[in-house]
């Protein structure tokens, strides 16, 4: 049976989707409203949290505590691990006080999420802390819908690949039939575009950025993607085969 409320002294990770507040799940909204503490991640170079902006209309600041915590992603591994440990310590302390804690994260908590580092810390050092997750709509699905591009039909293969991989591994993924989704293209766009052009796939590729947020763009021609279009929240969809049904 699905839980009807958050029990005292637990952590729930809520996926808030790609950016559009209307893509929040009903369950996510309900559990958000029941939380004593809402924790939102932000980057080390940002003063704001996109995840918080998505859910803030469902939070009551007079009743709920909102904590914004930095999740460093481009610092030395030791510094990043120290930050995750510190946040895990804080959450464990809140849970031990009987607080109902909700951690909000973009997309889905189990899909390339900042939350995963935190959960690993909690499970290894605080196994007594009850942890659960509420799925969110991934940017992959939202982008496919926005671009009207099917991710899989019949026996198609769907590959989801970080574009930060070395060239040989990216090339292997691009040689697979079906659809390839390239994530994290912000800092590797030119390299990815070149690989797609070499394989004659650039015209089958669609660039999508900032879904559901200000500055959203869907660009079906990679040659028209300019440097100012690149954003941390961007991906590329590549469909190798077209079915006629």
PLM-predicted stretches and their roles:
Residues 11, 174-245:
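A contiguous loop/helix-start segment that scaffolds small-molecule binding in enzyme catalytic cores
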Residues 47, 51, 139, 188:
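Short phosphate-engaging motifs
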Residues 88, 164-167, 189:
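Structural motif corresponding to alpha-helix initiation and N-cap regions
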């Amino acid at each position: 049976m699905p839980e009807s409320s958050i029990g005292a002294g637990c952590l729930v990770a809520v996926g808030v989707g790609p950016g559009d507040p209307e893509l929040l799940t009903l369950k996510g909204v309900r559990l958000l409203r029941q939380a004593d503490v809402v924790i939102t991640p932000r980057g080390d170079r940002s003063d704001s949290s996109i995840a918080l902006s998505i859910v803030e209309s469902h939070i009551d600041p007079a009743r709920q505590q909102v904590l914004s915590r930095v999740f460093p992603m481009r610092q030395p591994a030791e510094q990043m691990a120290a930050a995750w440990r510190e946040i895990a310590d804080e959450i464990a302390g809140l849970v031990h006080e009987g607080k109902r804690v909700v951690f909000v994260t973009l997309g889905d908590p189990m899909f390339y999420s900042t939350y995963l580092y935190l959960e690993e810390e909690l499970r290894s050092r605080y196994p007594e802390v009850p942890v659960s997750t509420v799925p969110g709509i991934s940017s992959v699905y939202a982008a496919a819908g926005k671009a009207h591009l099917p991710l899989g039909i019949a026996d198609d293969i769907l590959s989801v690949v970080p574009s930060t991989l070395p060239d040989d591994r990216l090339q292997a993924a691009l040689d697979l039939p079906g659809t390839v989704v390239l994530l994290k293209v912000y800092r590797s766009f030119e390299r990815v575009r070149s690989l797609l052009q070499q394989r004659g796939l650039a015209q089958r590729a669609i660039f999508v950025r900032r879904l559901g947020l200000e500055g959203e763009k869907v660009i079906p021609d990679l040659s028209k993607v300019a440097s100012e279009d690149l954003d941390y929240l961007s991906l590329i969809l590549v469909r190798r085969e077209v079915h006629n049904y």
